[in-house]
A protein has these predicted regions:
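Bacterial N-terminal signal peptides
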Residues: 7-15
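Ser/Thr/Pro/Gly-biased, low-complexity, turn-/loop-rich segments
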Residues: 20-274
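Bacterial N-terminal signal peptides that target proteins for export
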Residues: 1-6
Length: 274
């Protein structure tokens, strides 16, 4: 009886060994496949190219590879990098802004034109970083490791690839006017032009009654925001980069909408400028 039990135990041991050995190649193969999967994916929509990396790399490497894939001669100030893993954050911001505008439109129906304007644009989660290749090469602090800023993405515990979109475009030739106007306008860039020069190009009566007629905001292509006073008693010089957005803000908003102008500005900083 003892001999039979010993034989059975030995058989089970050998069976487990064979099973473990048969699983080992599969585990190694799976591990190898995971190692080969891209940990970082950067899409260049303008060039129709996707750059894949098996590990995170620095911005300089991506810009060098982009140049090698047809992105030579892009305009650095209007270049945009978007963090696709963080997209829900911008989607939530857009939903919040549209809801605020819908509520405002119950009191001020003219606000509906702003809803139409904002909904016509594409927004992605902007990864704000200097995309001037010369600056990235010469200044180490401008050459970060590309890592998603999404709070929901636990990189150490997730196999999810980090995904970015990099828009590298030629120098824009226009400036976009949005906000408290009847509709969006793309105006030809005026060298050394000031806000009055652009507003004079709009059709007569284009500004809404609820528009702020003393100040506006300029969202530069790199995401920097400048407030510009343009009333005759407090006007000041301003710079409009090629591809800038001029936001005509609302004036004298009810207290419950006190943050609306700033929320719209923040949303427009994430607009895909194509």
């Amino acid at each position: 009886k003892r001999t039979a039990l010993a034989s059975l135990g030995a058989a089970l041991f050998l069976s487990n060994m064979v099973h473990a050995q048969s699983l080992e190649p599969h585990a190694q193969q799976l591990k190898a496949q995971q190692a080969q999967q891209p940990k970082l994916s950067v899409e260049l929509p303008v060039q129709g190219v996707t750059l894949n990396y098996t590990q995170p790399v620095r911005l300089e490497q991506v810009l060098n590879d982009a140049n090698a894939n047809g992105a030579l001669g892009y305009f650095p100030l209007s270049a945009q990098l978007f963090d696709r893993n963080a997209q829900p954050q911008v989607d939530n911001l857009k939903a919040q802004v549209i809801e605020q505008l819908n509520q405002l439109a119950l009191q001020k129906p003219q606000a509906r034109s702003v809803i139409t304007q904002l909904e016509s644009f594409d927004y992605q989660a902007r990864y704000f970083v200097d995309l001037d290749r010369n600056a990235v090469i010469s200044q180490p602090e401008k050459n970060p490791l590309l890592v998603s800023k999404s709070s929901a993405l636990e990189l150490e515990q997730s196999n999810q690839a980090q995904r970015f979109d990099l828009y590298l475009t030629p120098r824009p030739i226009d400036v976009t006017v949005v906000g408290a106007v009847k509709q969006t306008h793309k105006l030809t860039l005026i060298e050394h032009g000031q806000l009055d020069n652009y507003l004079s190009k709009l059709p007569k009566g284009e500004l809404l009654e609820i528009a702020d007629r003393s100040a506006a905001f300029v969202i530069q292509p790199d995401g920097h925001v400048d407030e510009i006073s343009y009333a005759y008693w407090n006007s000041k010089q301003a710079y409009f980069a090629p591809g800038a957005i001029v936001f005509i803000a609302f004036d004298s908003l009810p207290s419950e909408f006190s943050a609306l102008n700033q929320n719209i500005i923040e949303l427009l900083r994430h607009k895909v400028n194509l």
